[in-house]
């Protein structure tokens, strides 16, 4: 199952960008034997400002995908539950899992409503670059849990 983090905007070179690359590479390598991956980040530029225009740009990357929207009103899941969900989707034959990260104002409510699920990183608001890094790390953590790796400790 391919895993994509589809996000509005391009990140400048930064420590967060390096973290995203590190965890995407780790998740891709660890997931290969489990039928997970590759893991990729797709940066989407919207030609017009606003949530509706951003949603239209994001929709171009969602065909045939199980979509989870990163949204502050979503469910915050423990890492094991997150891993179990990814494993369950893989076992159900989902070929592509997409996590959506919106722009500075979040995702368009209509796009969130169309998603198969919503994910939150708790009640706080996080900077865009950190949200990407945290999601990439959690995807890697989920893959390592499914692989039985000692990376995650309860």
Curated annotation (Swiss-Prot):
SUPFAM superfamilies: alpha/beta knot (SSF75217). It comes from the Bacteria. It catalyses: pseudouridine(1915) in 23S rRNA + S-adenosyl-L-methionine = N(3)-methylpseudouridine(1915) in 23S rRNA + S-adenosyl-L-homocysteine + H(+). This is Ribosomal RNA large subunit methyltransferase H. It is an enzyme of class 2 (transferase). It comes from Phenylobacterium zucineum (strain HLK1). Its main location: cytoplasm. InterPro entries: Alpha/beta_knot_MTases (IPR029028), RlmH-like (IPR003742), tRNA_m1G_MTases_N (IPR029026). Keywords: Cytoplasm, Methyltransferase, rRNA processing, S-adenosyl-L-methionine, Transferase. Belongs to the RNA methyltransferase RlmH family. NCBIfam families: PRK00103.2-2 (NF000988), PRK00103.2-3 (NF000989). Specifically methylates the pseudouridine at position 1915 (m3Psi1915) in 23S rRNA. Homodimer. S-adenosyl-L-methionine binds at residue 102. It is found in: Cytoplasm. GO terms for molecular function: rRNA (pseudouridine-N3-)-methyltransferase activity. Its EC number is 2.1.1.177. One of its GO terms (cellular component) is cytoplasm.
């Amino acid at each position: 199952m391919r895993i994509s983090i589809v996000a509005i905007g391009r990140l400048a070179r930064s420590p967060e960008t390096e973290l995203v690359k590190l965890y995407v590479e780790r998740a891709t390598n660890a997931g290969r034997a489990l039928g997970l991956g590759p893991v990729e980040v797709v940066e989407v530029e919207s030609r017009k400002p606003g949530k509706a225009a951003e949603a239209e740009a994001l929709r171009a990357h969602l065909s045939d995908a199980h979509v989870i929207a990163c949204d502050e009103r979503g469910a915050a899941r423990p890492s094991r539950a997150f891993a179990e969900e990814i494993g369950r989707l893989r076992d159900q034959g989902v070929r592509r899992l997409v996590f959506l990260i919106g722009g500075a104002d979040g995702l368009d409510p209509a796009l969130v409503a169309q998603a198969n699920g919503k994910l939150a990183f708790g009640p706080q608001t996080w900077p865009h670059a950190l949200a990407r890094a945290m999601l990439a790390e959690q995807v890697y953590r989920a893959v390592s849990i499914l692989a039985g790796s000692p990376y995650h400790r309860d």
